[in-house]
Amino acid sequence: MTRLAPTKKSVRTTSSTGNSVDLSKFNEQQKQIYNRIENLANFDCELELKDSVNVKFKNLDQAKKDEIYDLALSLKPWRKGPFLLDDIYIDSEWQSFIKFNILAPHLNLAGKCVADVGCNNGYYMFKMLK
């Protein structure tokens, strides 16, 4: 299993000297990442919701696995999670399952419509499907 660790680096709008940083390069990289995600083929997969959100792909060749791995690397830093994409474990700075597991016994979401606003990664959205 490949384990990807979170990074402590963050994007800043000023440099260490206090000068403004041109975010156009960052915005262009972001557009490239979105395009790569949109161009991914639809994969047949199984979803399993445990402490991590697990996605098991069916009939995925090594080239596609490598593409997913490279795309996952480009999405760093990972703040919330964890996620398991086939054999790629994406660790995170904040272990979202700890908080969710504390709240879950007190939540009755059956038949409810829930807006997962501001989580920045969808972890809780996936967990609320359960």
Task: Say what each PLM segment does.
Residues M1-L75:
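N-terminal auxiliary segments of SAM/dcSAM-dependent transferases
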Residues F83-F97:
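Class I SAM-dependent methyltransferase Rossmann-like catalytic core
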Residues E93-G111:
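Conserved alpha-helix/loop element of class I SAM-dependent methyltransferases that forms part
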Residues K112-N120:
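Conserved class I S-adenosyl-L-methionine
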Residues N121-K130:
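Conserved SAM-binding loop of SAM-dependent methyltransferases across substrates and taxa
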